[in-house]
Regions:
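Gly/Ala-rich beta-loop-alpha elbow adjacent to hydrolase catalytic centers
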Residues: 12, 16, 20
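Short beta-strand/loop motif that positions the catalytic acidic residue
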Residues: 130, 136-138
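Short beta-strand immediately N-terminal to the catalytic nucleophile in serine-hydrolase-like folds
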Residues: 10-12, 37
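Catalytic active-site module of serine/aspartate enzymes centered on a nucleophile-bearing elbow/loop
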Residues: 159-212
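Flexible "cap/lid" loop of the alpha/beta hydrolase fold
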Residues: 21-26, 31-65, 69
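Conserved alpha/beta-hydrolase catalytic His-Asp/Glu region
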Residues: 45-50, 63-126
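Conserved alpha/beta-hydrolase "acid-adjacent" motif
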Residues: 143-148
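Conserved acidic catalytic loop of the alpha/beta-hydrolase fold
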Residues: 1-8
């Protein structure tokens, strides 16, 4: 509203992707399309307790050790080391920029956002009702996002799923050319009026389509 933009293609990664999904739920008439990238951490029911526990550990580390010390550990998580292996210089810049964030702001975000947000598995009704063209995008080594990505693909009638090979969580930084190409192709199809809704026949209780 402040920018006086009536409708837009909305692209978000990680927490931004979660916000993008909710934008589609709440303001579908304002979204030309949605790119929901790297979304799903802590979504699976069996992982929720551990995820909330780790959120508490992260917040405590931020407040007690400060942002620089935290960034030096967090950057080497299991879904971020892929970036270091591909582009050490880019990864070093990522880590430096991360260290400049506010420790208090980051801790509050962990506690009040990450720790309190609903599981994607509790939002299935909202997904099924949404018709905004949606691209679900994830890296194939962004382990916490793989099953939730399949969930969103299955439950959002207007969604497609793209998986970037040998990529972790920071897919827009790890392989910006591929990321931008996938997103650009998607937006181009939407703008051309060629983005389809899924044929209802594509979802069936049958595995082969040949029911006995």
């Amino acid at each position: 509203d402040h920018l006086e933009i009536e409708r837009a293609h909305v692209v978000g990664l990680s927490m931004g992707g979660f916000a993008t999904l909710h934008f589609g739920f709440r303001h579908p008439s304002r979204a030309l399309s949605l790119v929901v990238a790297g979304v799903g951490y802590g979504a699976e029911k069996e992982q929720q307790a551990r995820f909330k526990e780790e959120v508490g550990v992260v917040a405590k580390s931020l407040l007690e050790e400060g942002m620089a010390a935290f960034a030096g550990k967090y950057a080497y998580g299991p879904t971020r080391v892929q970036f270091e292996n591909k582009d050490p210089r880019g990864f070093a810049e990522f880590k430096r920029a991360l260290a400049e964030h506010s420790a208090l702001g980051s801790a509050n975000t962990q506690i009040s956002c990450q720790g309190e947000r609903p599981s994607l598995y509790d939002l299935i009704a909202e997904m099924r009702a949404m018709t905004v063209p949606t691209l679900v995008l994830t890296g194939d080594e962004d382990w916490p996002c793989l099953a939730p990505a399949l969930l969103m693909k299955r439950e959002i009638p207007s969604a497609a799923l793209a998986v970037m090979p040998n990529c972790g969580h920071t897919i827009n930084l790890e392989d910006p050319d591929q990321f931008n190409r996938i997103v650009g192709d998607f937006i181009g199809q939407v703008d051309a009026g060629r983005w389809p809704r899924r044929d209802p026949r594509a979802l069936s209780a049958s595995i082969t389509g040949m029911k006995g």
